[in-house]
A protein has these predicted regions:
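Substrate-access "cap/lid" subdomains that shape
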Residues: 98-99, 196, 203, 229-232, ...
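Alpha/beta-hydrolase fold nucleophile elbow
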Residues: 209-220
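C-terminal motif of bacterial Sec signal peptides marking the signal peptidase cleavage site
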Residues: 18-20
Length: 469
């Protein structure tokens, strides 16, 4: 089964949302230098239609004494911004995270954003779209996504951002919150990063031809969840004017659940109390300064050494970023309403991304005595479809339908929903993509971008580029 899983991942890379996409070589373009509060940045281009500005810092690196604190403003207007080799936030490497390497990759110095706009954008005032990547709030990077086609075809300025992930982005501990003041008392540092990126966008996007009074936030999976978090967060008031949540969910935990002392809540795994135990530290008495001095990869190693059979507490109803009543209830409360148009939806076959990896449902038959990858097939088509339909509808019921009903209760007037259906992928002798995956979790992203993802495999999956528009 171990071999089968690895092979299946390779065969289904087009549907693993957080896998890098190919881009043409970028070259500096004269006359595209833009001044920002973070420094001056020169645009680059792979074609004549759009300009990219890459790796712009929107906050100070959250490392050292700034680990597990609210993002701090970064100002260097006279500096020259250079594209970096990597801006990935620390995470576990692998196909799903779209990162290469062994064990863990990335740096705490990762709070950067990219901007892509039509070549003539700076002579106009165009709508702005800010993309929040998915990945369970534990993986992912802005670098995965190329919104060039969306920017050009729809004449919009697109911003893609990084934010802290996993235990670096979400933690609840008596010393961290107990010794802090103001926003530093939050448990939701990843979402504070997103808010900081939106604040930077408000102050600077007009220099790129964007309209700071016409900002749409959009995100998929955990990105959609974070869109909901922004809809209920008082800290995000006035930072956006429309919201799109793709395959979102509304799960939050209380601070007590996030700490989970002595595994008081056995249905939750990888709480902060467990993390400190894995680090061989006293979960109740270790100081915040001691925690901030630990090597970041040691923290990640301890975090991923913990079993994960249940939900991991991440987004926390801390009463600062997310109201203390929790996300789902806050969505229905008029006092948190942003009164903006909201579009939310899910995919017909959300859960095939995970069920297609489950040997209970899928065979991996050896080919040529194991010399070729296994041929994947569903064991029982009727049973497979039953569970796919049931669980995908459950995702929609809670993540979309209930959330939108709650927004209606809060007084939102312009609410829209969708369901994404697709089973027109190219067939492979090794796997029937339409029947095994169909409209899987994340399958819509290439259509939103307006171009195939995932390099050569994506070109195979989308033989006609226009099919992803």
């Amino acid at each position: 089964m171990h071999l089968m899983s690895k092979t299946f991942v390779l065969l289904t890379v087009p549907f693993l949302v957080l896998t890098g996409c190919s881009q043409p070589p970028m070259k500096p373009v004269s006359g595209t230098e833009v001044a920002t509060e973070s420094g001056r940045v020169i645009g680059v281009a792979g074609n004549e239609q759009v300009i990219h500005w890459q790796d712009i810092p929107f906050a100070q690196p959250p490392e050292g004494s700034l680990r597990w604190r609210a993002p701090q403003p970064y100002s260097n207007p006279e500096g020259q911004i250079q594209a970096r080799e990597s801006t990935i936030c620390v995470q576990e490497s692998g196909a799903i995270s779209g990162t290469e390497g062994t064990s863990f990759v990335g740096s705490e110095d990762c709070l950067y954003l990219d901007i892509v706009a039509p070549s003539a954008a700076r002579d106009q005032v165009l709508p702005v779209m800010v993309w929040i990547h998915g990945g369970g709030n534990t993986s992912g990077t802005k670098d995965t996504y190329d919104f060039s086609a969306l920017a050009y075809d729809q004449q919009v300025v697109v911003v893609t951002i990084n934010y802290r992930l996993g235990p670096l982005g979400w933690i609840t501990h008596p010393s961290i919150q107990g010794e802090a003041e103001g926003l530093d008392k939050s448990s939701n540092f990843g979402q504070l990063d997103i808010i900081a990126a939106l604040e930077w966008t408000q102050r600077n996007i007009q220099n790129f031809g964007g309209d700071h009074n016409n900002v749409t936030i959009f995100g998929e999976s955990a990105g959609g969840h974070n869109v909901y978090a922004l809809l209920v967060s008082p800290l995000a008031n006035g930072l956006f004017h429309r919201a799109i949540a793709q395959s979102p969910y509304t799960t939050t935990v209380t601070p007590r659940e996030a700490f989970n002392r002595n595994r008081e809540f056995p249905e939750l795994d990888r709480g902060s109390w467990e993390l400190l135990q894995a680090l061989e530290l006293d979960p109740d008495t270790t100081s915040a300064s001691a925690l901030r001095s630990i090597d970041v990869y040691e923290i990640m190693s301890a975090y991923y050494s913990l079993e994960k059979d249940h939900l991991s507490p991440l987004s926390t109803a801390d009463g600062i970023v997310i109201p203390a009543v929790g996300m789902e209830q806050a969505l229905a409360d008029p006092q948190y309403s942003k009164s903006v148009p909201v579009l939310s939806g899910s995919n017909r076959d959300e859960v095939t991304l995970w069920m297609g990896l489950n040997r209970y449902f899928v065979n991996g038959d050896p080919v040529l005595f194991g010399l070729l990858p296994p041929r994947m097939s569903v064991k029982n088509e009727e049973m497979y479809r039953y569970w796919v339909d049931l669980r995908s509808r459950a995702w929609k019921a809670r993540g979309v339908d209930q959330a939108m009903l709650n927004l209606g209760e809060a007084g939102y007037e312009n609410l829209y929903t969708y369901r994404f259906d697709w089973d027109e992928q190219a067939e492979s002798w090794f796997i029937s993509f339409p029947s095994l995956l169909g409209a899987a979790h994340g399958a819509e992203i290439a259509f939103v971008m307006g171009a195939p993802m995932f390099g050569p495999i994506g070109d195979y999956m989308y033989p006609d580029t226009s099919s992803a528009r």
